[in-house]
Amino acid sequence: MAESKVEHLLDSIHFPEDLRHLSQDKLEQVCADLRQYIIDVLSENPGHLGASLGTVELTVALHYVFNTPYDRIVWDVGHQAYGHKILTGRKDIFHTLRKFKGISGFPNPAESEYDAFIAGHASNSISAAMGMSVASALKKELDRHVIAVIGDGAMTGGLAFEGLNNASANPNNLLIILNDNDMAIDHSVGGLSQYLVDITTSQAYNKMRYDVYRGLKKIKLINNDRRENILRFNNSLKALLTQQHNLFEGFSIRYFGPVDGHDVNYLVKVLNDIKDMQGPKLLHIKTKKGKGFKPAEESATEWHAPGKFNKETGQRIIVRKLDEPQLYQDVFGHTLVELAENDERIVGVTPAMPSGCSMTYMMKAFPDRAFDVGIAEGHSVTFSAGLAKEGMIPFCNVYSSFMQRAYDMVIHDVALQKLHMVICLDRAGLVGEDGATHHGVFDLAYLRPIPNLVIASPLNELDLRNLMYTGYAAFDGPFVIRYPRGKGEMKDWRNEMQVLPIGKGKKLRDGDDIAVLSIGPIGNEVIKAIEMVKEERVSIAHYDMIYLKPLDEELLHEIGQKYNRIITVENGVIKGGFGSAVLEFMADNGYTPHVKRIGVPDAFIEHGSIPELYQLCGMDAESIAKQLKKEN
């Protein structure tokens, strides 16, 4: 009978309004039900498990207390929002999560009115929610609440602190919920903390606090200057009682907590107590990443996005073929260690992605020369610049889509000084199931105009090693290498590293009719496409250009003089990217071939598998083969 009760509660909730119709004593069962549903679905349909298991009680409490979607919930990053999706009309299609034409793995306003703001990159929630809260005040929507939910990891991002610093500058009733899951901030949850929350959230306390201030002002014992002194005294007293200085109240944000983020009934009480308080406020909750699934609780990093797993045994289902190609990420990690073994100046830097980019190899081999700086892409670049300025040779590894956040630092702090560092752009190109917020498709276009940069992309793992060596040994300025997520093409890649001449491409295949110019691993799709049309009466040349900047102008002159038809292929946006650079060269030098550019179109590409997205963009071997036939 207990199982039927669980199923009944789950089946009865389609939208938050259904949840709000339940009595509060049912909420614990709703949480257990929701947590199990997430585990059931993600065991077969991979996604971000740990973070969403940790926010089940918070999600239920938020939708129970607040009138969503009129009230706005802004999720930071969005990894923790799966429960939110299930409770807001997407339970029956949750199994399509991160699949092509299915629902997104992140909050997306185009998908649901309950998704108040786009999420994917960290640390934006406070600024976005503050803007929405101020807008509500300007529109006299005094009954609308705006809540930002941010994890302690995302709080390391500079944008979060910019939002905190500005939160009290304009009238707003913003509520910030800090989800502290022991990944960065560590405060204990005890009787004193809960007692302080009970006191500071009680209506009687806050009415007294307001009445005292109003009374002092009425009898002219308080003005704005004295008000600041009283606030400082209040904050100092609380700091004394808690034996800590409160950062948030230093920003004039009222602080409550920490509280147990897995006590749904207490969360409901606290949220009801503070939701109508005037001014910006922050509720600090303590949660456990992976809560309710023992393997995920015990290994938060491994179970952040574990892939398929056996929900009964807790074993991850990892299918690997014998002698399959290595991940580009592992090639980077092993190669960096090899280089570092021979030069003590080499250091590694990454903003919060040591496992994803395989900086962990460097951290294990040379812990004093490898740095995880947290979710702080701009800092990672400028920190690396400082290292380079003092004679170190940093390898700064940043995901391509996250490097967008450090653009000014690349220009101002690195390129202007022509500092010797290697910037490795991991996850370059289409990345698959994480979708539009994570596709690394803009880097070729946004880095190409910057003076002093060398920009390269390897065809395979062998050339990734060679380019890392080239950036280290053969160029004394900033050297950018972009490469994709996932497996490469080769089983035997541990070559003796060699310099790839800067600004020089390679002819992979000779031909007389059509010249195909590719850059990066997408060239392997070209190789397959040419094989598909080998029976056609067309002679196709294929060039692996390797370098976007500087271009191999000598080779391009030869191509411009010989071919009337050119196809460029890149795993990036075609506007402003590699194909555009080839077109500019041809126009500037008086060549007039017909140039067809293949790459990512002028659109934000959805989520799906790499083969599906390649086909969508016409970048897969079959689509390229069709274009070759069309050009014939």
Curated annotation (Swiss-Prot):
GO cellular component: cytosol
Binding of thiamine diphosphate, residues: 79, 120-122, 153-154, 181, 293, 377
MF terms in GO: 1-deoxy-D-xylulose-5-phosphate synthase activity; magnesium ion binding; thiamine pyrophosphate binding
Top enzyme class: transferase
GO BP annotations, alphabetical order: 1-deoxy-D-xylulose 5-phosphate biosynthetic process; isopentenyl diphosphate biosynthetic process, methylerythritol 4-phosphate pathway; terpenoid biosynthetic process; thiamine biosynthetic process
Residues that hold Mg(2+) according to the record: 152, 181
InterPro entries: Dxylulose-5-P_synthase, THDP-binding, Transketo_C/PFOR_II, Transketolase-like_Pyr-bd, Transketolase_BS, Transketolase_C
Cofactor: Mg(2+); thiamine diphosphate
Keywords assigned by UniProt, alphabetized: Isoprene biosynthesis, Magnesium, Metal-binding, Thiamine biosynthesis, Thiamine pyrophosphate, Transferase
The reaction(s) this protein catalyses: D-glyceraldehyde 3-phosphate + pyruvate + H(+) = 1-deoxy-D-xylulose 5-phosphate + CO2
Protein name stated in the entry: 1-deoxy-D-xylulose-5-phosphate synthase
Organism annotation: Parabacteroides distasonis (strain ATCC 8503 / DSM 20701 / CIP 104284 / JCM 5825 / NCTC 11152)
Gene that encodes the chain: dxs
